[in-house]
Amino acid sequence: MTAPPIRHVPVLGREAVAMLAPRAGGVYVDATFGAGGYSRAILATAETRVIGIDRDPTAIAGGSGLVEESGGRLILVEDRFSHLAAVCAAQDAAAVDGVVMDVGVSSMQLDEAGRGFSFRLDGPLDMRMSGHGPTAAEVVARASETDLADIIYIFGEERRSRAVARAIVGARRHGPIATTRALADIVSKVVRAKPHEIHPATRTFQALRIFVNEELDELIAALAAAERVLKPGGRLAVVSFHSLEDRIVKNFLAWRGKTGGGSRHRPEIERAPPSFAILTKRPLTPGDDEVQANPRARSARLRAAERTDAAAIDDGAELPAWPSLANVMRGG
């Protein structure tokens, strides 16, 4: 008799679903379906419906069992989570009761050498979540030294970004940098780490992954889309894993949760009513038991907010001036 498959337990899963507070008959969006942990927990509440979104076709295929088990209450859509408003509209769910997001790379992606996300497993230098668009190997081969340095500094917060970029450009003159191990070896020669510190290539790999998948642009767009689709009283829960993501979520909710501001030096400015009420004044973090069971959970942060009845705030904010995948790949 074969043992049943181990069910994926998402980081801060219990806390995130508690923040959503699923109710019978509610419609929820699992914007980063992954292995389906959040969806399964939401579906445990009677008569709930879940729209699961993931840009990774492997995740969508892997969720077929849960779709069948749910009796039609789970619908899976292969798409970017920045498109969640359009996905919801296509499923006759223009307004929903909750949205949960688990931002960044999944354990499944990290643990599969062929996906090229991890410096710990040798494989092709790919890093694409969807399988579409330029690979990390193509970025490393074509980006200028200046662009590489900016990418590694901005998205990886690597202080030695210029030295890493210089080493990459020097190495690629002798042949393609096609594997994760090849890149990790190049970075390790210029970034030194003590035994108790993170691997020297950690920040460079993070930077390339974020850049290849346009993760921060996607997150900004997804937060705004969630604001548009949530009903009054609907809830948003976001789990992030590094400071760049968490800062975006924190700033978005802080801006959307303010009623105005001013001081004796500066009169209060007129602004729209807040579209969110913050539920987590400080982010929730994993307990010791969860970190011990899953060391990758150590950096996780959960922030949540409840949608007010105010209109979504269209502030026309532009994306920050960081390197663009399209511009870098065409040499612009």
From Swiss-Prot:
**Reactions accelerated catalytically:** cytidine(1402) in 16S rRNA + S-adenosyl-L-methionine = N(4)-methylcytidine(1402) in 16S rRNA + S-adenosyl-L-homocysteine + H(+)
Residues bound to S-adenosyl-L-methionine: G36, G37, Y38, D54, F81, D102, Q109
**One Gene Ontology term of the molecular function aspect:** rRNA (cytosine-N4-)-methyltransferase activity
Location(s), subcellular: Cytoplasm
Transmembrane domains' residue ranges: none
EC number, UniProt record? 2.1.1.199
Q: What class of enzyme is it?
A: transferase
Q: State whether keyword rRNA-binding applies.
A: no
Q: Which GO terms describe its biological process?
A: rRNA base methylation
Assigned keywords, A-Z: Cytoplasm, Methyltransferase, rRNA processing, S-adenosyl-L-methionine, Transferase
Q: What InterPro entries is this protein classified in?
A: RsmH, SAM-dep_MeTrfase_MraW_recog, SAM-dependent_MTases_sf
Gene Ontology cellular-component terms for this entry are: cytoplasm
Classification via NCBIfam families = 16S rRNA (cytosine(1402)-N(4))-methyltransferase RsmH
**What does this chain do?**
Specifically methylates the N4 position of cytidine in position 1402 (C1402) of 16S rRNA.
What's this protein's family per the entry?
Belongs to the methyltransferase superfamily. RsmH family.
Q: Kindly provide the name given to this protein in its UniProt entry.
A: Ribosomal RNA small subunit methyltransferase H
What species is this protein from?
A: Nitrobacter winogradskyi (strain ATCC 25391 / DSM 10237 / CIP 104748 / NCIMB 11846 / Nb-255)
Task: Tell me what gene encodes this.
Answer: rsmH
